[in-house]
Design a protein with these regions (language model features):
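Conserved SAM-binding strand-loop segment of SAM-dependent methyltransferases
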Residues: 96-107
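S-adenosylmethionine
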Residues: 107-203
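Conserved Rossmann-like nucleotide-cofactor binding loop
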Residues: 82
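Conserved SAM-binding loop
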Residues: 87-88
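Conserved SAM-binding loop of SAM-dependent methyltransferases across substrates and taxa
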Residues: 59-71
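Conserved SAM-binding motif I beta-strand of class I
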Residues: 73-78
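S-adenosyl-L-methionine
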Residues: 1-53, 62
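Conserved S-adenosyl-L-methionine
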Residues: 56
Length: 208
């Protein structure tokens, strides 16, 4: 099995958004962060042989990271058809043979029922854009309804919200850690070539 560093290298070929939409907060998950999240999930036996669901897969970074760690299958959900098409191409670049089901759908209104235990991995919208406040709440509601365990990336300072949401919806935060998230200049309101934003990653166990 690849080490975390090797997994990061495998994910370095994943192409990002061709035409990112600021309103949808389409920022590619950095390979280093994706590898860290997937490696942690693997250490907890939450990937191998399981069904993994990536809500808001974008161009497939977390989906493909999970696919490289031996799951039974991965279900990748994305509302925007353009990055989803890029994700399908990224699968070819990465070279995984794990079954991946690409689903163009709203992750906050998931149109399927999954009978087996599910691990969710996701980097949802942070709700940083005007009118998008609390955008990750809808994603978490889906997680609470389908997952037995989840790994999700959120804006720094989300601890109280995440813990309260988990408590109210049959979940328990078991692990949390800070992580740097490098954002490239891809929108008109970005002044720097790139910048780092502070994020937090949460592992939550759910009873549903």
């Amino acid at each position: 099995m690849a080490t975390k560093r090797e997994l990061e290298g495998q994910l370095a070929v994943v192409a990002g958004f061709e035409d990112p939409q600021a309103a949808l907060e389409q920022y590619p998950t950095p390979p280093a962060l994706a590898a860290h999240v997937i490696h942690l999930a693997d250490l907890h036996d939450d990937i191998e042989g399981r069904t993994v669901v990536d809500l808001g897969t974008g161009t497939g970074m977390l989906t493909l990271g999970a696919a490289l760690r031996g799951p039974a299958r991965v279900i990748a959900v994305e509302l925007d058809g353009s990055p989803l098409a890029t994700a399908v191409e990224n699968r070819r670049r990465v070279g995984t043979r794990t079954p991946i089901h690409w689903l163009q759908a709203d992750a906050t209104q998931l149109p399927l029922s999954i009978p087996e235990p599910v691990t969710v991995v996701m980097n949802p919208p942070f709700g940083a854009q005007d009118g998008r406040e609390g955008a990750d709440r809808g994603f978490l509601s889906t997680v609470a309804s389908v997952a037995s365990v989840s790994y999700s990336v959120h804006n720094a300072g989300s601890e109280a919200f995440i813990e309260a949401f988990a408590d109210d919806n049959g979940g328990e935060v078991t692990h949390a850690f800070s992580a740097a998230f490098t954002v490239e200049n891809q929108f008109a309101h970005h002044d720097d070539t790139q910048r780092e934003i502070d994020t937090e990653v949460y592992r939550i166990e759910w009873t549903n």
